Amino acid sequence: MRVRKRLLHTLISHELVDLFFFLLVLAYVRVAPYTKVEESFNTQATHDVIFHANDELNAWDHKEFPGVVPRTFLGPLVLGKMTKILARAMEVVVNSNPVTKRVFRNEKIWGELKHLVETLNEEETFVRTKMHYQVIMRMILGCASTFSLHKFHAVIGKNFGNDVAVYASALALAQFHLAFYASRPLPNIFAFALTTFALSLWLEERRGLKINSSVLDTLAIMVVSMVVAVFRCDNILLLAPLGIHVTLFRVTDIYDASLRIIANVMAMVTVIVAFAYTSITIDSRHWDQEYLWPEWEVLSFNNPMGANRSHHYGTKPFLWYWYSALPRMLLIAYPLSMYGFKHERRCRSAFMIASFFVFAYSFLGHKELRFLFPVLPLFNFCAACGMHRLNLNRKKSIKGNFLHALAWMGVIVSCAVSIGVFAKASIANYPGGEALAAFHELNPERDASGHVRLHIDDHCAQTGASRFGQAYHDHNVILYNKRQDHEHDDWFINEYEKMPKGYEIVRNITGFIGVKLNKKFPFWPPILVEKDVRVKVWRKRRILEDEQ
């Protein structure tokens, strides 16, 4: 029995669980390849980096639809260049080997993505549709997020033991939001990959290292400072408690504290100034504005003590993060993190930093789940410490054994809820992208001028109908219109129940509308995801008559 337990302990490592997490990220990319309105800017900007030269800025999407607040192009520029390089490499690999050619042309393997891929001839390349580029783009971002999370778990394993690292990895795997959003081009995810890496630097020095511990502290401060300057200014709420902790609680005397304050403040200011200058230089050109710093614009837009224009997009109660957002995002890790804070001294600083972030963010009336991504690894670390404590106590009493079993049952239930409810609902929440793909499947006929004119309404544009979903080779034939003037358009994808006389519905696209309890015997699954027609594909009846 002991040999079996040791063998099992050796085989189950956080590396293995992190591998499953990465595979889950890729699975979500495959079954939900589209992006929504929150990801719109980075998605469209990355598309334009790939398909338009820098001297063609007037053709870029942000020129026509600038959005509410300017965002930085630094992320899309890097991601777009990496996507082009990887796409070219995949073309070489796939087309140089007959086995890989057959694999990547197999519709059974591609499943739900097959309608995005035209039948490929032997001489044609693999990366043919724009949607392929979007999938590759998301794979790259998913790799970056997974690597940072793996680094964080590796540091936990090194300093707190393999069991704690496995628990942290298992909790991340059981949560829906981390894996589903890890590959999505949100500014929050660009920031998440960097802040998680910074937190691993901060956590790594809890045990003696050959390198000076203050160096890792300073590096962590520098990475978060870069995030503040470029991607998410709200991470100042993470930078502040992190800086206070490394300055006040990791010093030996007043002299050491003074040196650390000077070093960390200088590093923070230097990085913020350097990357703010970089952002201003690049973004001012792309936005065609003088001295534009996007994150300063975002800060001015969201500042609760200033104009705070974000409240026009909806507000929630002060405690909403605590009673709604965190329970949904963390699931079983939410109570376990509190248990870990109470019973495990080593994780208390992490819990306090994460709690300060959530508490400070609660003062902003406009609240969203994605705002909390930077501190999810910290809460999971605290929850993993709590599970480890339960594991140590399980043989000491019946109560300890019961709580340990209850915790693992919670992990299993969390997995079931994540996949059976959250994932199923979210996958069905991109009717705009599905409608655009369905339109291309119909092989629309050209009009007298040799064009196909499609109008995309706001709802479809916000639920997946991005530039990546548009035709690759027929981009001069199909004219996509997202403006209000649509009297010359023959095709429409929209959520309207009725259209003017002369239009015909040719395809209905279903989407997520809600969840409900299953009241029919045998009551399985207990929670049902409801779908209904969300978007319709219309075309003029004249076209139908001409084709007949």
Predicted feature residues:
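Start-transfer (signal-anchor) and selected internal transmembrane alpha helices
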Residues: 1-28, 134, 263-274
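Signature aromatic-anchored transmembrane alpha helix within multi-pass, membrane-resident enzymes
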Residues: 15-21, 272, 347-355, 381, ...
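Extracytosolic helix-loop segments that constitute the early lumenal/periplasmic catalytic or substrate-binding loops
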Residues: 23-26, 41-70, 74, 81-93, ...
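Membrane-interface alpha helices of multi-pass inner-membrane proteins
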Residues: 25-29, 168-170, 174-182, 196, ...
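Transmembrane-lumen/periplasm boundary regions of multi-pass, lipid-linked membrane glycan transferases
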Residues: 188, 224-367, 420-425
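Catalytic lumenal/periplasmic loop and adjoining terminal transmembrane helix
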Residues: 284, 397-547
